[in-house]
Regions:
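Short, well-ordered secondary-structure micro-motifs
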Residues: 46-47, 94-96
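Helical scaffold of the NTase/Pol beta-like nucleotidyltransferase catalytic core
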Residues: 1-34
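Metal-dependent nucleotidyltransferase catalytic core
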Residues: 9-10, 18, 57-87, 92
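Short connector loops at helix/strand junctions that flank enzyme active sites
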Residues: 29, 48-50, 76
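Basic nucleic-acid-binding interfaces
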Residues: 28, 61, 102
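Conserved NTP/Mg2+-binding pocket subregion across the NTase superfamily
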Residues: 96-105
Length: 105
């Protein structure tokens, strides 16, 4: 972990800790699995980096469920969030995302 990451961006450890302190997150948004990936997972985030999450829902997500989770996370972290539904990952990038993903729960 670099000083730049500590000063300018959230670390993976911080993001995971904050999420794990949300006791009803998985139940409320019907989440089966959730993982952090991207620059924050690699501890290369800056103050302008978004957060990337790989998510699998327990049910087929409605737009309301998807957007509800996205907005909740954006408010929680005060930054843009990209939610990627696991079944929608393009095969060309699936391996890279899965390899760097860090499970939330």
């Amino acid at each position: 972990m670099t000083n730049q990451t500590q000063e300018n961006g959230l670390t993976a450890e911080t993001v995971l800790q904050i999420l794990r302190e949300q006791p009803n997150l998985f139940q409320e948004y019907q989440i089966k699995t959730m993982a952090l990936f991207g620059s924050t997972a690699r501890n290369q985030a800056t103050s302008t980096s978004d957060l990337d999450f790989l998510v699998e829902f327990q049910v087929d997500p409605t737009l309301g469920l998807y957007m509800g989770l996205k907005l909740f996370l954006e408010q929680l972290f005060q930054r843009n969030v990209d939610l990627v539904i696991q079944s929608d990952i393009k095969p060309q990038i699936r391996t890279n995302i899965i390899q760097e993903a860090i499970d939330v729960a």
